[in-house]
């Protein structure tokens, strides 16, 4: 709202830049806090948001610098609320990001909806409602959550297929009936289709269920943003940007598949969705319900310490079971696909049943390695081996997308004795087509377009495909009713990585993908292929021993002082000049010694495990402490003493998911 008074008003404005400060501008109209304006910043026009307002008579002394005029008013009413400002302050402080860039994160761009525009809500079968029936266990859990007065944070800890989603949907129905707002977090955009499809058939409220993510048109995002800001009752489904909506009546937060690493933003601001959800839960006194068959170790530890109410779901919603689980030691197998797995797939085909093959790698084969000198052909921009992709007949870097022709000889010793080591999804596809020429086979991974992936998934659901091969995407949220055989290839991928979460990742991935085969039928067969059958994460996943894995992993982390027993901050220095990155990393460390205390441990300075990515050399320091405030003080105080240059970029990650 703009009030027309003839006077001069001063405004502190947030601009989308990586600085944690506001900037003074003036205007001759009384503008509302929270609206967007156009300003001149360092010679270029930028959009800013008014955060504070001052009257001319509030300043007794004149400014020592010239204050520029606001160029243009963009909004007639505020686009953000006090809640958005509070949240941005909290995130920027916690993640060491600029206040302005944090405030703008998730905000729809300035665009206007078309006249009479309607939102793309779920409207395929608007008159159809499938009655959502809960079993006794689900009904008791549902009543416990909505009836609890003292406890507001819950975790549904149940094996895949135990019926967590049905409880989530029932909770959505309850809070919509109370005219409240619901935030439904999912780990990937691709899962939105599955979740929405299930809600659609359970509730006749298609006009109250929306997606909010980077794929949604900007005009639609503006409409959803305003609906939330105006207090309309709805369910909004999204990943990270959805957390920034201007909620006013938020009473339920759902976090499906809480363990997924995609909830952590790897771009500025580098927050974790779980941490912001806790902030929102306290702010709105909402219920926060997480769920997973494989909780993150941090969540499990919090449940163990009674910081989160653990609700164990004992029963499987579909009452299915796994008939047989086998581990195949691939050291004794000559082929990519073991004879045991091939036999099981053929048997499934004979019974008109389907097979799901999971492989933890993209690409056709992995590294191109010289048998003479052992040299691995790497990306010239990154310290990472190039991977062969058959469709393009090229070597591709999965970090910076560098492409080159396949090599005929070793660039190190000129030997022609070079071979591809290990294998990927495209080779598995080729092998299956060779052994089973009459089977209908498809694969889904991130090398294929989204439309092609969705088409393959739909065909598999409709039993038009016999064998579906996939990478990580098939471990996340899909329910296939006609599976007989599940094959897991390369179960131990990641085992040798120098990363404290590698064991947890392997256990989680195996447990989740095994759950895909155990939902509907009661004669499923799972075959796990590995060269390390005794590795603890594989062993516990194979035996379905969840609690035992978590206890052993906690013991390992405690001995190493890693999370959840310590807070961790990783600082990466990257530059196209290796010496510059190295020097700045060491300079930061030397300056930080002034603030190092006994309670703070450090690793480094050292080269990052992935030393070079996209032509940038990387050096890092890792700080650990039980007290986050000590780490926060150390980083902020050291930053003040270190002069940064345009040739070295610093990344501060307050909660690193990976140390690679």
UniProtKB/Swiss-Prot annotation:
Q: Which residues are recorded as binding Zn(2+) 2? A: 379, 382, 397, 400
User: Which GO molecular function annotations are given, in alphabetical order?
Assistant: 3'-5' DNA helicase activity; ATP binding; ATP hydrolysis activity; DNA binding; zinc ion binding
Q: What is its EC number?
A: 5.6.2.4
Q: Which UniProt keywords apply?
A: ATP-binding, DNA replication, DNA-binding, Helicase, Hydrolase, Isomerase, Metal-binding, Nucleotide-binding, Primosome, Zinc
Q: How is the cofactor bound?
A: Binds 2 zinc ions per subunit.
Report domain Helicase ATP-binding positions. 145-313
For biological process, the GO terms are:
DNA recombination; DNA replication initiation; DNA replication, synthesis of primer; double-strand break repair
Catalytic activity reads: Couples ATP hydrolysis with the unwinding of duplex DNA by translocating in the 3'-5' direction; ATP + H2O = ADP + phosphate + H(+)
The cofactors it requires, by name, are: Zn(2+)
- Which Gene Ontology cellular component terms are annotated? primosome complex
Chain ranges for the short sequence motif DEAH box as given in the UniProt record: 256-259
Q: How does it assemble?
A: Component of the replication restart primosome.
Q: What's this protein's function?
A: Initiates the restart of stalled replication forks, which reloads the replicative helicase on sites other than the origin of replication. Recognizes and binds to abandoned replication forks and remodels them to uncover a helicase loading site. Promotes assembly of the primosome at these replication forks.
The protein's name is: Replication restart protein PriA
């Amino acid at each position: 709202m703009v009030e027309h008074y003839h006077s001069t008003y001063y405004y502190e404005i947030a601009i989308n830049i990586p600085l944690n400060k506001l900037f003074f501008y003036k205007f001759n109209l009384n503008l509302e806090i929270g609206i967007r304006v156009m300003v001149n910043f360092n010679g270029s026009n930028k959009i800013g948001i008014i955060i504070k307002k001052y009257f001319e008579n509030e300043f007794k002394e004149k400014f020592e610098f010239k204050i520029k005029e606001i160029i243009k008013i963009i909004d007639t009413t505020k686009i953000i609320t006090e809640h958005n400002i509070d949240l941005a302050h909290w995130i920027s402080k916690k993640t060491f990001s600029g206040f302005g860039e944090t405030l703008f994160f998730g905000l729809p761009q300035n665009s206007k909806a078309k006249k009479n525009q309607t939102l793309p809500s779920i409207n395929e079968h608007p008159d159809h409602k499938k009655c959502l029936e809960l079993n006794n266990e689900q009904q008791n859990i549902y009543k416990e959550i909505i009836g609890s007065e003292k406890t507001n944070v819950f975790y549904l800890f149940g094996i895949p297929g135990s019926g967590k989603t049905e409880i989530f949907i029932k909770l959505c129905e309850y809070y919509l009936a109370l005219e409240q707002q619901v935030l439904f977090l999912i780990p990937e955009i691709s899962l939105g289709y599955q979740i929405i499809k299930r809600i659609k058939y359970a509730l006749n409220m298609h006009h109250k269920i929306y997606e909010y993510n980077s794929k949604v048109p900007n005009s639609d995002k503006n409409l959803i943003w305003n609906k939330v800001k105006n207090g309309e009752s709805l369910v909004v489904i999204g990943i990270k940007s959805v957390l920034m909506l201007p909620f006013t009546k938020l009473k339920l937060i759902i976090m499906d598949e809480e363990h997924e690493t995609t909830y952590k933003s790897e771009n500025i601001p580098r927050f974790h969705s779980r941490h912001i959800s806790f902030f929102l839960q306290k702010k709105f006194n909402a219920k926060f319900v997480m769920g997973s068959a494989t909780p993150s170790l941090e969540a499990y530890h919090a449940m163990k310490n009674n910081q989160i109410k653990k609700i164990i779901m004992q029963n499987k919603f579909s009452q299915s079971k796994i008939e047989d689980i086998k581990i195949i030691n691939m050291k004794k197998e000559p082929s990519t696909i073991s004879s045991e797995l091939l036999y099981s797939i053929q048997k499934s085909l004979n019974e008109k049943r389907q097979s799901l093959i999971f492989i933890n790698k993209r690409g056709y084969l992995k590294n191109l390695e010289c048998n003479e000198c052992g040299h691995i052909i790497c990306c010239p921009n990154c310290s990472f081996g190039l991977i062969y992709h058959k469709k393009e007949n090229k070597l591709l870097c999965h970090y910076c997308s560098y492409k080159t022709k396949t090599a005929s000889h070793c660039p190190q010793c000129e030997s022609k004795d070079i071979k591809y080591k290990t294998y990927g999804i495209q080779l598995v596809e080729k092998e299956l087509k060779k052994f089973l020429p009459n089977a209908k086979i498809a694969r889904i991974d991130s090398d294929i377009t989204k439309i092609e992936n969705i088409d393959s998934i739909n065909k598999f659901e409709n039993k038009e495909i016999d064998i579906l091969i996939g990478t990580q995407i098939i471990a996340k949220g899909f329910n296939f009713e006609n599976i007989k055989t599940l094959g897991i290839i390369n179960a131990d991928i990641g085992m040798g990585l120098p990363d404290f979460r590698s064991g947890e990742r392997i256990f989680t991935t195996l447990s989740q993908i095994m759950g895909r085969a155990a939902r509907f039928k009661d004669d499923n067969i799972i075959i796990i292929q590995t060269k390390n059958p005794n590795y603890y994460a594989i062993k516990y996943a194979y035996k379905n021993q969840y609690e035992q894995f978590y206890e052993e992993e906690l013991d390992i982390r405690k001995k190493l002082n890693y999370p959840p027993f310590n807070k961790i901050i990783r600082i990466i220095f990257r530059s196209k000049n290796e010496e510059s990155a190295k020097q700045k990393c060491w300079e930061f460390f030397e300056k930080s010694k002034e603030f190092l205390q006994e309670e703070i441990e450090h690793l480094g300075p050292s080269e990052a495990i992935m030393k070079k990515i996209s032509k940038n050399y990387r050096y890092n320091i890792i700080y650990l402490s039980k007290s986050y405030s000590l780490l926060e003080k150390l980083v902020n105080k050291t930053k003040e003493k270190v002069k940064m240059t345009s040739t070295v970029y610093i990344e501060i990650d307050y909660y690193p998911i990976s140390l690679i």
